[in-house]
Every structure is written in structure tokens, then in C-alpha cells.
Swiss-Prot record:
Keywords: Cytoplasm, Ribosome biogenesis. It is found in: Cytoplasm. It comes from the Bacteria. One of its GO terms (molecular function) is ribosomal small subunit binding. This is Ribosome-binding factor A. It comes from Albidiferax ferrireducens (strain ATCC BAA-621 / DSM 15236 / T118).
Amino acid sequence: MRKKSKTPNRAFKVADQIQRDLTELIARELKDPRVGMVTIQAVEVTPDYAHAKVYFSLLAGDPKACTEGLNQAAGFLRAGLFKRLHIHTVPTLHFLFDQTTERAADMNALIARAVASRAKED
């Protein structure tokens, strides 16, 4: 009987560790004024560990400028990850603004309006 491949589980562990380390690196070592209060929401790593999509949200500020700042600092952050992670290949980082929280707020507003209009009708 063949053993199950542990690669997917390892990929999740690597992505989780990248998320934790990036959070610390951005908060403590990144000095770019365009990058404000950033929260790393998720990290998706390709099966060959060559690339990682890093989804982030922003408390305040311009998401476009923050994305530019993070993508320009990707090499610096990757070097910091290389010192912390003990894996052969540290992925190239691609930062993407996560609009999930904004969409959730918009959806909540739509639901609240629908409930309010239904209450007026009754």
C-alpha cells in the first residue's frame, strides 16, 4: 500500500509560516510610508514553491499605493523570509489587496436596507 503524499499538508504549513513571518517583517522592519496598518489575510503557495500570492487588507490608506509599496519591497521581504524559513526555495512574493472585508461591509449594508424596507412594508 502506498503512503499518502504529504505535499499538500506541507504546502499549507509553509504558507502559514510565511504568513506569520511576513506579518512580523512588515510590522518591524519595513519602513515604507506607503505601507500602513497591513494585515496578511492569506498566503497561497504554488506546488513548486516558486511563487506565493499574499492577500492583505488595509486598515487605513490607499490600497493601490500600499500594493505598490509591498510589491517593491518583495525582494527585501523575501530575503527576510530566507533567513527565517528553512526550505530550499523561498517563493517570489506577489501582493494582492484582499477586498473581502469591503465586500462583506457592502453586503451587510444591502441586507440592512432590505430588512429596513421590508419592515416599512409590513
